[in-house]
């Protein structure tokens, strides 16, 4: 880095500020810092503020350096401390934002309205509910409880920490709201499984004359929960409002259609998208694999590798392994599994090991699947064992070495109170005509008051999902169930048409 001694420069301070604006690496930042000391500018508040900004928020990010600067300075400007707090809030150590605020209080630096949004964002990042509640007390103390940005971040915090009632309370008490406020509360509802309330909230938003944006639609699409009719309705809103089909919105549409079984629509959106990222490709590949279009999924993966600059991630490989499972491609499954780490530097996760067990289990290679589990680099979870036990039930004639028995014992050791495990074991005994053993398992379940999770049936009618569970008390639900079935029968009758050849 070349420093000019030309007298045309108004001052060394001006020169330092120019280089700080151009700084793009820690190496350059340290050089500039050295020149600042040589120029005796190390106590200049504006220079310190710029140094903190660059080391907290730019490409030359070094939060430890920014922290040291502030600790050795007498800067009492809240905006400078806010920059360090903001840097920590989006770092791997968001809890350090709390230290920044504590240091501000110790020095008697009064916070401003930008102080608390960064602190609340940090609390959401490390799921610091207690810390977040303490920050909310500080918000009230300093009179920022009516600030819209503070409110939005409080909603985000409580939603992330699964406190939807608190999130809704903050939202309801806001005197000023913007689109982000509505998006925040709807996101909180989606993340906590309250999908029906999301669309009620959206209707309320429209009723209050707020204009939904791209984020609103992405949130609504994630709330469709496999409801194709509802997904189409949201898509129509995207088109009516003439929102740009960018990568983020397009990916949300592809993901929704793929999860809802509307693969033709997913393909149409996918093909029309100009910009696709790894999540777009992965959503399409996973959707195809899960709905039986395994060969097409593998072809699409091959196309992604050859014709685009996009590199696969862990979700992409999950879709690829799922496709191999559905087509019985055991050798290809092994190949892709090993390529993950060797070529693409993606360390296989539990879910990938489970997918390989599924591939081997479906192919009837029970011993191989069992050995594969025993060689895993970490302790397999119950899902992996259940996958193998399911395969043992299907291929019980080929289980010469009693793999099913070993898996059964291990599964009960891992989850002794999970009723589903004992149900699987009882069914396995029944399939093998071991009636006494099956009865014994059922007896244990009954004595320990262990109940099987009720089976659930879903019916989509008029854009709404209606759920029915086995074991309903007919005295309470009988009438409404049969009224709905009569309505369904009527709709089928109305839609029925004879086709003449």
Swiss-Prot record:
InterPro entries: E_motif (IPR046848), Pentatricopeptide_rpt (IPR002885), PPR_At4g14850-like_plant (IPR046960), TPR-like_helical_dom_sf (IPR011990). Pfam families: E_motif, PPR, PPR_2. PPR repeats lie at residues 77-111, 112-146, 147-177, 178-212, 213-243, 246-276, 277-312, 313-343, 349-379. PROSITE patterns: PPR (PS51375). Residues 463-493 are annotated as: Type E(+) motif. Keywords: Repeat. GO terms for molecular function: RNA binding. The keyword Repeat applies. Residues 384-462 are annotated as: Type E motif. It comes from the Eukaryota. NCBIfam families: PPR. This is Pentatricopeptide repeat-containing protein At2g36730.
């Amino acid at each position: 880095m070349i420093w000019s001694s030309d007298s045309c420069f108004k001052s060394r301070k001006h020169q330092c500020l120019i280089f700080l604006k151009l700084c793009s690496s820690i190496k350059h930042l340290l050089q500039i810092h050295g020149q600042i000391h040589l120029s005796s500018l190390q106590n200049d508040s504006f220079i310190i503020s710029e140094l903190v900004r660059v080391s907290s928020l730019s490409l030359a990010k070094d939060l430890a350096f920014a922290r040291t600067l502030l600790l050795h300075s007498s800067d009492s400007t809240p905006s400078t401390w806010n920059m360090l707090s903001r840097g920590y809030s989006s770092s791997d150590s968001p809890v350090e934002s709390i230290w920044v605020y504590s240091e501000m209080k110790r020095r008697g630096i009064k916070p401003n309205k930008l102080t608390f949004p960064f602190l609340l964002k940090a609390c959401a990042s490390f799921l610091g509910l207690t810390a977040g509640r303490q920050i909310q007390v500080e918000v009230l103390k300093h009179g920022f409880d009516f600030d819209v940005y503070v409110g939005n971040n409080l909603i985000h915090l409580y939603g992330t920490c699964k406190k939807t009632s608190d999130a809704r309370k903050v939202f309801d008490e806001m005197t000023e709201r913007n689109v982000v406020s509505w998006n925040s509360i709807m996101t909180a509802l989606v993340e906590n499984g309250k999908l029906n309330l999301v669309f009620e909230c959206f209707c309320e938003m429209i009723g209050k004359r707020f204009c939904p944006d791209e984020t609103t639609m992405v949130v609504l699409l994630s709330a469709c929960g496999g409801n194709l009719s509802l997904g189409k309705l949201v898509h129509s809103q995207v088109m009516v409002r003439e929102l740009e089909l960018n990568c983020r919105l397009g990916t949300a549409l592809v993901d929704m259609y793929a999860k809802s079984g509307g693969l033709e629509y997913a393909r149409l959106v996918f093909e029309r998208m100009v910009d696709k990222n790894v999540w777009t490709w992965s959503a399409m590949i996973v959707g195809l694999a899960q709905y039986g279009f395994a060969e097409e999924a593998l072809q699409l993966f091959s196309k992604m590798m050859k014709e685009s600059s996009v590199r696969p991630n862990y979700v992409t490989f999950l879709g690829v392994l799922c496709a191999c499972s559905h087509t019985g491609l055991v050798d290809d499954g092994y190949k892709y599994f090993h390529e993950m780490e060797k070529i693409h530097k993606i360390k296989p996760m539990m879910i990938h090991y489970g997918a390989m067990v599924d591939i081997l289990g479906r192919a009837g290679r029970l011993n191989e699947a069992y050995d594969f589990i025993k060689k895993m680099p970490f302790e397999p979870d119950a899902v992996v064992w259940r996958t193998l036990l399911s395969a043992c039930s299907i291929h019980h004639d080929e289980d010469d070495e009693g793999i099913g028995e070993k898996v059964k014992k291990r599964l009960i050791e891992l989850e002794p109170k999970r009723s589903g495990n004992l149900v699987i074991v009882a069914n396995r005994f029944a399939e093998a005509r071991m009636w006494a053993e099956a009865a014994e398992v059922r007896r244990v379940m009954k004595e320990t008051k262990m109940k099987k999770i009720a089976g659930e049936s879903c019916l989509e009618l008029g854009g709404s999902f209606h759920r029915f569970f086995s074991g309903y008390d007919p005295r309470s639900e009988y009438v409404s169930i049969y009224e709905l079935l009569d309505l369904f029968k009527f709709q089928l009758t109305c839609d029925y048409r004879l086709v003449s050849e």
